[in-house]
């Protein structure tokens, strides 16, 4: 049995025999792998899970599936971490784009994910030759329920994501369909589909590609330098500072609906809106008036006044990391806090006011919510 990689380092002493016999101790992880473990735990485990098995928030995929690791090149994983998956909860973590990770930190995460995994396979190069129309029929019948459509996300990886399709090879996609992602719900389709049908599906998935929009780059007007942890606050923290307090009705004593928040803004009620995502996400799209308070840096909350003003946090999960921010605020004694229930993309879909980077592509509709 393979132990989850994050837990393996912690339990190695417990695996030693109890007979008193001498046993050669396992070498400690290299500094690079240890750095990757710590970096992963801080930034990635929230959604992908402590053991990288995925599906903790927003259906973040497993990063430990053998069929993923044996087919995903370092370059592909690096692009996924650095550029993210725009329109989803997977942020761009590269410091160049306003995220918290420099290139060595990204490489350390990759080294950590590779620990105990299979060797990288040499997959065929070049495009897959398939029939797009036939592939759509197969996709609609077998894949769309989990993977969605270009305009609607669902419970699994959104295969129409432009950055995914710009960085994934046809061979990577073909291997995923053929071999699945054990032990996740993505089953192997080899046998259920013929090789020609798999080629057709890959051709159809590839046909959904559109050129990804250029990411919003930090500038002197937004951040001090590319690796700055937070955009400096040029606007007010408190919106409508002379307004009355809103009268929210919370679900489960935690969640406030986007409709209530929009009405409070329309009524000029006093409140604070905190974006719990990475600054790179804030740069690309945020609710008008929101400040950047990334979930991994509680220092970002220090300037928020603790005077009874309502503080509303949001994210794209739709409310996992924003829940962490609200939990921290409540721990500090803030009396009026809530999570914006449906998240940023439902807010955008409702055509409520946002600040978006020039050229930002419309996000696919988020999947149905589950508390």
Segments and roles (model prediction):
Residues 1-32, 104-110, 369-371:
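N-terminal export/targeting leaders of redox proteins
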Residues 298-347:
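Catalytic cysteine-centered active loop of the rhodanese-like fold, especially the PTP/DSP P-loop
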Residues 29-50, 77-79, 129-150, 173-179:
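Sequence/structural segment immediately N-terminal to covalent heme-attachment motifs in c-type
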Residues 206-273, 279-281, 357-371:
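Flexible, polar/low-complexity N-terminal or interdomain linker segments that lie immediately upstream
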Residues 21-38, 114-138, 249-252:
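Electrostatic cytochrome c docking/interface patches
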Residues 25-29, 53-55, 100, 115-130, ...:
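Inter-heme linker and motif-flanking segments adjacent to c-type heme-binding CXXCH motifs
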């Amino acid at each position: 049995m393979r132990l989850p990689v994050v837990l393996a380092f912690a339990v190695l002493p417990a695996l030693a025999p109890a007979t008193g016999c001498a046993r050669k101790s396992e070498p400690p992880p290299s500094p690079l792998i240890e750095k990757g473990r710590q970096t992963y735990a801080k930034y990635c485990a929230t959604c992908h899970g402590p053991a990288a098995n995925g599906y903790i928030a927003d259906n973040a995929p497993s990063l430990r599936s053998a069929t993923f690791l044996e087919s995903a090149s370092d370059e592909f994983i690096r692009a996924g971490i650095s550029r993210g998956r725009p329109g989803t909860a997977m942020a761009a973590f590269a410091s160049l784009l306003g995220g918290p990770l420099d290139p060595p930190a990204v490489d350390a995460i990759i080294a950590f994910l590779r620990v105990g995994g299979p060797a990288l396979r040499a997959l065929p190069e070049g495009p897959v030759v398939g029939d797009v129309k036939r592939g759509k029929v197969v996709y609609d019948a077998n894949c769309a329920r989990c993977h969605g459509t270009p305009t609607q996300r669902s419970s699994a990886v959104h295969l129409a994501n432009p950055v995914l399709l710009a960085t994934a090879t046809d061979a990577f996609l073909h291997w995923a369909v053929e071999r699945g992602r054990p032990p996740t719900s993505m089953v192997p389709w080899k046998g259920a589909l013929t090789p020609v049908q798999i080629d057709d599906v890959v051709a159809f998935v590839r046909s959904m590609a559109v050129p990804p929009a250029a990411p919003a780059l930090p500038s002197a007007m937004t951040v001090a330098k590319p690796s700055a942890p937070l955009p400096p606050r040029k606007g007010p923290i408190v919106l409508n500072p002379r307004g009355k307090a809103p009268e929210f009705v919370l679900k489960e004593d935690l969640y406030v609906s986007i409709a209530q928040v929009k009405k409070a803004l329309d009524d000029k009620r006093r409140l604070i809106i905190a974006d719990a995502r990475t600054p790179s996400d804030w740069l690309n799209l945020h609710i008008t008036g929101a400040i950047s308070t990334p979930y991994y840096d509680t220092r970002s909350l220090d300037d928020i006044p603790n005077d009874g003003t309502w503080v509303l946090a949001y994210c794209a999960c739709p409310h996992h990391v924003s829940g962490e921010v609200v939990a921290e605020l409540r721990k500090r004694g803030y009396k009026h806090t809530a999570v914006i229930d449906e998240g940023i993309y439902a807010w955008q879909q409702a055509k409520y006011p946002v600040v978006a980077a020039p050229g930002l592509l419309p996000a696919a509709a988020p999947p149905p919510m589950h508390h």
